[in-house]
């Protein structure tokens, strides 16, 4: 639940270097140029995240950034957005907390062009949610699957393109499902449009899917032998584009990650081997080449048939037959007839490629199903959805795949517009909120151009119609499609045609699509002959990948790839609309993929088409937060007695009551017909802080009661265990032998300045103010803290130079790891003195709670070392001193402490040169034990007060200074990864391994080496969408919500600040000299209650004078 009472000890943005503005709503000038300049300034200083209200802008740094470790996870967990610099962890934490508190599904839509960093952003969100959510072994298993699904799906679904070295060639919507307690206990992946054509063809300079290169680089010698793995240029499919290696990708290491991921997900070793067999089989399939014999295709070299047949478990002759011929069914009248058709070379190559594409797609679907089955749960409760989908892209030659990819991105842009620009403004009108509309470009016109069914029909409808009417025709279908497009939508302002294709004016710019293969790829039909061939495999696993029932009659029009992606896109939109959305807008700063390289025109183009300027204007003029009355009352009911546990009256009046209870200014909110609208994020933060403080207070009451109950039960046993350490060895004090053990005698909850020295999640076992004696036996007070890991001695010093000169600050004097303590020495008398012995030097300390301290220290020492801590008892103790830096003659030396029988219960100390003499009267016998009777509470921190005022007196005007802030530097060690399962060495096939034939030519030999133009990498022409953006009417300078009426003069008493005061707790006011403060309540304690700049809190009355 956040940082509770120690907000000022969080690492806050004002403690680090500022670069531009964190939230672009605060920009003084709202233009594309000022947005680009702010992003550039931050990017060059390695700040890749920036806010627009709650929207996160992320610029791809093209390098590993240092702020994604355990320290940052701790920093952002439970913290409000304004407390820390912009970060993807803040957005992830907001999603997770809102899901738990509001009981609503959340989703994050990550958008941006190819190479902008969407996939990496999705990984960070999933890893953060996995890290901060709790759970036992079963939950941990689900977390492991969530995290390991990434490398597995990337291996089979990602590839290097000219724009991105790790480009997602499929779309993915990952739902992490949670129990009501916020533990991830299930998940589900929906995948969209795998670009399977990449297996058999791609642009120059690109690669196929990573798994092919991983297998060749990472397979063991035994695997290479059995799978026929050799050099990359041996395989036609890989040599097509002439690109094998990628600078920042280690295929050998990634192959081991892929195998480990399959193990974690629960894919059996036999299935893993079969998956790799199919991957190798695809590569060998590509090496089958054809020649023309009498106008028909024949296999050029039949020895290349043997290895793919062997790996896929099929007959070599059947493979040859199905690649060069096909059974076609024809109907004449009422009769059906099957005709055997021999294929030409082009058709045979197409058939071979169709089989290779189908094999890869079916394996990919198998992996997705395996992941889903491993995370399956019988019912859904709450979930967080992460949308990681291929980015908008433009290549030298753009085909059907790019058309589908850019259509999905067009739909995502529409969602953003609908929810952040259009719906927000319409909501103000519906709710009766005063508002001046802000114009923007709505890309719905482009979506309709692509997906509309009628009046006029969209491109996809026309494409499906052509495919249906020309289903038996291979040639000429693409030109027919182009002609129909020109006839039906040729006049559309966002559409143009050219001799080989058409142009769409997308929101992100003009894209030229080549018609070649459009209809064939849209049909996406796998011939029955190939399904029969794979069903004839001797391997049940491969058979299971092709479950089609070939005997069933095919009725109706077959589903096309275009209609499938359109349905998937619309289903995705429906799913996202049911969730509370969050947005990450990814920006690609350059095409070189190098850090610190900034292309101004490219970034400006993205800023324009992403609509960031309009987003800032709507956010700035509008309301940061809106909620239906009932939900608002439910969330903040705990703030007042009248609303808790339920408000009995009119919901609108209940909301107004809550807002007035926190003294929110009336110009900071409006009440609509069914919702409350809050303007400034700071006002919302005030509500959240008050709510958190209430829950924190009640939680402390419950904790205190429970701890008291547990303590009463255990303290007798604890005292007895502690006394056993000293039994028959040391005399005991009469007043302390039966006392309770408190542990915290300082009140650490009220002293965050001491907590800064301890790890944030480190438990404090013992805290007390002790006396520490130096080499001259001069006593000085120290705070002694004991945790399971370390012992701390903290002192105070006055700062001698710098901006904090004159301030007294806490200083860590000594930190000893528990296992480094050698022994502890004590006398046999009833005194409170003990010596901690350590390798370097000893510490002479005095504490009235030594018995309790020693019992806890011995327990922690045993946990760390599995040994008993040596305790030495003698009336002459040796003390080893610290070496002083006084040159070559420096020496630590030693001192002696001698104990004598004296009078009274207070020890009398007499230092004499190098000896300290301690005399004290006799105590209880050494064999004394605590009794089991009830005892009165010993001195210690009570843990609370009976009023809301600070326990300290009101501070004197300037002269007393509060302690400074120190940033917490504790970092958890990284978790070691487990051992990975060894590679599989044997194949699952009964066939004998055939010899590997020599490849006669590579794919690059078969392709014409024409030089490729790189013009497509330039910033695209903005087209009609850009023109529409430029011509949208601008609102008047004071557009948006009308200026509120001036507030009436206050009728409450006021005072003027004589001096500046910095709040030292969350319920206090900070103010500057000459500030005017409204006085709410005067109190004799010296702490008055007042209100300044919309915040109510306590302040010292001797810093002000009444007006």
UniProtKB/Swiss-Prot annotation:
Gene3D superfamilies membership: 1.10.10.820, 1.20.5.4820, 1.20.58.530, Kinesin motor domain, Myosin VI head, motor domain, U50 subdomain, SH3 Domains
Compositional bias per record (Pro residues), positions renumbered to this chain: 1034-1051
Domain IQ, chain residue ranges per copy: 695-724
Tissues in which the protein is found: Detected in brain stem, brain cortex, cerebellum, stomach, colon, heart, lung, liver, spleen and kidney. Detected in utricle, cochlea, outer hair cell bundle cuticular plate and vestibular epithelia (at protein level). Detected in cochlea and vestibular tissues. Detected in kidney, lung, spleen and intestine.
The keyword Magnesium is assigned to this record: no
Segments for region (Disordered): 920-1052
UniProt cross-references to SMART domains, sorted A to Z: MYSc, SH3
GO function terms (MF aspect): actin filament binding; ATP binding; ATP hydrolysis activity; calmodulin binding; microfilament motor activity; phosphatidylinositol binding; protein-containing complex binding
Chain residues that bind ATP: 112-119
SH3 domain residues: 1050-1107
The keyword Phosphoprotein belongs to this UniProt entry's keyword annotation: yes
CDD domains per the UniProt record, alphabetical: MYSc_Myo1, SH3_MyoIe_If_like
Myosin motor domain: residues covered: 19-692
Phosphoserine sites (modified residues): 1001
Domain named TH1: residues: 730-922
Start and end residues of each stretch annotated as Actin-binding: 581-591
Signal peptide: none
PROSITE patterns for this protein: IQ, MYOSIN_MOTOR, SH3, TH1
Source domain of life: Eukaryota
A GO CC term assigned to this protein in UniProt: myosin complex
Key words of the record: Actin-binding, ATP-binding, Calmodulin-binding, Cell junction, Cytoplasm, Cytoplasmic vesicle, Cytoskeleton, Lipid-binding, Motor protein, Myosin, Nucleotide-binding, Phosphoprotein, SH3 domain
Subunit structure: Interacts with CALM and F-actin. Interacts (via SH3 domain) with SYNJ1, DNM1 and DNM2. Interacts with ARL14EP. Interacts with CARMIL1.
Function: Myosins are actin-based motor molecules with ATPase activity. Unconventional myosins serve in intracellular movements. Their highly divergent tails bind to membranous compartments, which are then moved relative to actin filaments. Binds to membranes containing anionic phospholipids via its tail domain. Involved in clathrin-mediated endocytosis and intracellular movement of clathrin-coated vesicles. Required for normal morphology of the glomerular basement membrane, normal development of foot processes by kidney podocytes and normal kidney function.
The family this protein is said to belong to: Belongs to the TRAFAC class myosin-kinesin ATPase superfamily. Myosin family.
The name this protein goes by in its record: Unconventional myosin-Ie
Native species: Rattus norvegicus (Rat)
């Amino acid at each position: 639940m956040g940082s509770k009472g120690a907000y000022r000890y969080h690492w806050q943005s004002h403690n680090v270097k500022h670069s531009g503005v964190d939230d672009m709503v605060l920009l003084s000038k709202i233009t594309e140029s000022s947005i680009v300049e702010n992003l550039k300034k931050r990017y060059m200083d390695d700040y890749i995240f920036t806010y627009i209200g709650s929207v996160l802008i992320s610029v791809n740094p093209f390098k590993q950034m240092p702020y994604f470790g355990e320290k940052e996870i701790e920093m952002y967990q439970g913290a409000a957005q304004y407390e820390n610099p912009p970060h993807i962890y803040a957005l992830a934490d907001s999603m997770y907390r809102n899901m738990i508190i509001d009981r609503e599904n959340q989703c994050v839509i990550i958008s941006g062009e190819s190479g902008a960093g969407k996939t990496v952003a999705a990984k960070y969100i999933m890893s953060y949610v996995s890290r901060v959510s709790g759970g036992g072994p079963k939950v941990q298993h689900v977390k492991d699957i969530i995290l390991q699904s990434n490398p597995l799906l990337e291996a089979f679904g990602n590839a290097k393109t000219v724009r991105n070295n790790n480009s997602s060639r499929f779309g993915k919507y990952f739902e992490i499902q949670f129990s009501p307690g916020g533990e991830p206990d299930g998940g589900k992946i929906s995948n969209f449009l795998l670009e399977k054509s990449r297996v058999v063809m791609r642009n120059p300079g690109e690669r196929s899917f990573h798994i092919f290169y991983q297998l060749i680089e990472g397979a063991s010698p035994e695997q290479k032998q059995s799978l026929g793995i050799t050099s990359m240029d041996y395989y036609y499919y890989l040599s097509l584009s002439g690109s094998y290696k990628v600078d920042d990708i280690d295929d050998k290491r990634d192959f081991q990650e892929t195998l480990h991921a399959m193990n974690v997900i629960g894919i059996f070793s036999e299935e893993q081997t079969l998956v790799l067999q199919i991957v190798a089989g695809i590569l060998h399939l590509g090496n089958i080449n054809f020649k023309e014999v009498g106008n028909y295709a024949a296999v050029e070299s039949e020895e290349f048939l043997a290895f793919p047949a062997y790996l896929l478990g099929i007959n070599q002759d059947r493979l040859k037959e199905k690649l060069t011929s096909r059974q076609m069914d024809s109907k004449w009248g009422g009769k059906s007839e099957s005709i055997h058709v021999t294929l030409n070379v082009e058709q045979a190559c197409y058939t071979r490629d169709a089989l290779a594409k189908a094999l890869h797609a079916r394996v990919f679907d198998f992996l997705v199903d395996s992941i889903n089955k491993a995370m399956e749960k019988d019912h859904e409760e709450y979930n967080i959805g992460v949308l990681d989908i291929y980015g908008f892209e433009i290549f030298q030659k753009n085909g059907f795949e790019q058309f589908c990819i850019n259509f999905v991105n067009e739909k995502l842009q529409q969602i953003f517009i609908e929810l952040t620009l259009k719906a927000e403004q319409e909501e103000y009108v519906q709710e009766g909120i005063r508002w001046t509309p802000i114009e923007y470009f709505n890309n719905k016109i482009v979506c309709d151009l692509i997906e509309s069914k009628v009046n006029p029909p969209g491109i996809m409808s026309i494409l499906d119609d052509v495919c249906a009417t020309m289903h038996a025709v291979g040639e000429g279908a693409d030109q027919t499609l182009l002609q129909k497009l020109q006839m039906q939508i040729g006049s559309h302002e966002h559409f143009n045609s050219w001799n080989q294709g058409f142009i769409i004016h997308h929101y992100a710019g003009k894209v030229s699509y080549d018609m070649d293969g459009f209809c064939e790829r849209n049909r996406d039909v796998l011939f029955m002959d190939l399904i029969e061939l794979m069903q004839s495999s001797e391997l049940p696993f491969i058979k299971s990948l092709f479950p089609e029932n070939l005997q069933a009659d095919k009725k109706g029009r077959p589903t096309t790839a275009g209609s499938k992606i359109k349905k998937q896109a619309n289903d995705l939109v429906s799913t996202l609309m049911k969730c509370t959305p969050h947005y990450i807008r990814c920006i690609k700063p350059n095409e070189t993929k190098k850090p610190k390289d900034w292309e101004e025109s490219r970034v400006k183009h993205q800023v324009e088409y992403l609509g960031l300027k309009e987003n800032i204007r709507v956010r700035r003029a509008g309301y940061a937060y809106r909620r239906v009355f009932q939900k608002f009352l439910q969330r903040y009911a705990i703030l007042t007695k009248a609303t808790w546990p339920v408000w009995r009256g009119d919901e609108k009046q209940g909301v107004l009551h809550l807002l007035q209870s926190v003294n929110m200014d009336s110009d900071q909110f409006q009440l609509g017909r069914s919702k409350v609208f809050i303007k400034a994020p700071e006002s919302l933060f005030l509500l959240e802080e008050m709510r958190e403080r209430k829950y924190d207070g009640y939680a402390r009451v419950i904790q205190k009661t429970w701890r008291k109950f547990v303590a009463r039960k255990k303290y007798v046993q604890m005292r007895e265990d502690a006394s056993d350490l000293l039994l028959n060895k040391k005399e005991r004090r009469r007043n302390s032998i039966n006392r309770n053990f408190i542990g915290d005698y300082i009140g650490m909850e009220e002293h965050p300045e001491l907590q800064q020295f301890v790890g944030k999640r480190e438990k404090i076992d013992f805290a007390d103010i002790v006396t520490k004696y130096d080499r001259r036996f001069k006593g000085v007070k120290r705070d002694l803290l004991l945790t399971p890991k370390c012992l701390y001695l903290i002192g105070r010093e006055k700062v001698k130079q710098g901006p904090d000169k004159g301030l007294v600050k806490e200083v860590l004097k000594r930190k000893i790891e528990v296992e480094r303590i050698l022994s502890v020495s004590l006398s046999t008398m009833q005194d409170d003195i003990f010596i901690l012995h350590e390798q370097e030097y000893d510490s002479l300390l005095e504490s009235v709670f030594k018995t309790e301290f020693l019992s806890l220290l011995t327990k922690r020492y045993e946990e760390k070392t599995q040994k008993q801590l040596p305790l030495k008892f003698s009336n002459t103790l040796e003390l080893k001193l610290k070496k002083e830096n006084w040159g070559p003659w420096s020496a630590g030396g030693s001192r002696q402490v001698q104990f004598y029988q004296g009078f009274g219960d207070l020890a009398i100390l007499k230092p004499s040169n190098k000896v300290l003499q301690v005399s004290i009267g006799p105590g209880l016998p050494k064999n004394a034990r605590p009794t089991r009777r009830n005892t009165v509470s010993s001195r210690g921190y009570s843990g609370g007060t009976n009023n809301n005022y600070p326990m300290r007196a009101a501070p004197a005007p300037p002269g007393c200074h509060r302690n400074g802030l120190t940033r917490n530097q504790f970092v958890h060690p990284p978790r070691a990864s487990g051992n990975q399962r060894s590679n599989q060495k044997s194949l699952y096939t009964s066939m004998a391994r055939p010899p590997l034939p020599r490849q006669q030519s590579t794919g690059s030999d078969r392709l014409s080496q024409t030089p490729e133009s790189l013009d497509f990498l330039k910033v695209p022409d903005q087209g009609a969408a850009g023109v529409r953006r430029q011509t949208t009417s601008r609102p008047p300078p004071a557009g948006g919500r009308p200026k509120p009426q001036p507030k009436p003069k206050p009728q409450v008493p006021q005072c003027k600040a004589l001096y500046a005061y910095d709040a030292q707790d969350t319920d206090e006011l900070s103010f500057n000299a000459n500030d005017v403060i409204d006085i709410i309540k005067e109190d004799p304690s010296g702490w008055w209650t007042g209100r300044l700049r919309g915040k109510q809190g306590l302040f010292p009355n001797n810093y002000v004078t009444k007006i």
